[in-house]
């Protein structure tokens, strides 16, 4: 008799929004490049499904922790037209949860480096390795991309499968955090830190030590960016977020100054003027945009940039942004866009930083939830009631 498990499943009817023409891949695979364009009457419910069996090149992971991402909150409810609010790649139905850790419970016959009992994390972006983008090393732009927790069953479940090539060992975190349980809870937060690393360093090029930086948004990715930029030698780290709890977390991980942007906007004041005052006229060597509302932030970001400064766009939105290129050109500025976290040694680098105590995502792990309470965890994240929330399906 096949073993069953509990899982949080997102569903929806494949019904392209009126006026939207699906691509060939969307029609063929019944997937969506933007879920909000295709999936109608979305659902999110705890179900029972069979425990998956690993293929020859896969591992079966007993999930230790599944961290709640802002993307997951978009699977709650629907928009005014009863379409999914998730503006990203997905194929429904699918078990969501893409930030995770666990202990290997079984391995496929062709798995070479990993074994049962290893503690691992895995990249979300399940790249093919064969398309032109992958052959260039551009794994986050894979033309045949699958994504764990969006188009392949994810981690709000007792078990999941992942290809060995996507996995990295984190056994060393047990020594850092004192127990396997705590190590796996914190390890589930490696993915958002890897996303921040990709945006700040791989795509954004980093900063010279002594440069000032600004971070819009003190959610988990913004907090990760602050942690990484402090480690890399930023002087002033100025963080904007209306949430007082998240402002406090930002200061704990390295922000030197935190502000509620709406307090200034409501008074008709520009954030760029504030940044220039705090930096004594120098401006920001880098501005990290880590919200879902760049339309409000980017015009300010352009004005607060120092000469040859960089905007690192990590937050994702389907909305348009007004940008006047001439202002960027006069400053010799750069605007880099980032998505995902695969390749370039990003995950091993992040793991080593945590093992060395240079960054600690555990500082903003606010609460753990049982799998049965996973929707409650996602709702808490939607309300920004803390830093990071982690679902622990097996304890």
Residue ranges, per PLM feature:
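Adenosine-nucleotide cofactor-binding segment
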Residues: 178-179, 209, 215-218, 230-298
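C-terminal hydrophobic helical "lid"/dimerization subdomain
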Residues: 1-3, 21-22, 273-274, 288, ...
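NAD(P)H dinucleotide-binding glycine-rich loop of Rossmann-like/cofactor-binding domains
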Residues: 87-93, 98, 128-216
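Glycine-rich phosphate-binding loop and adjacent beta-alpha segment
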Residues: 251, 260-262, 266, 294-356, ...
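A short N-terminal beta-strand-loop micro-motif at the entrance of redox/enzyme domains
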Residues: 14-65, 87, 91, 110-111
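Glycine-rich beta-strand-centered segment in the early N-terminal region that forms part
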Residues: 50-67, 81-132, 173-174
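N-terminal Rossmann-fold NAD(P) dinucleotide-binding loop
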Residues: 222-223
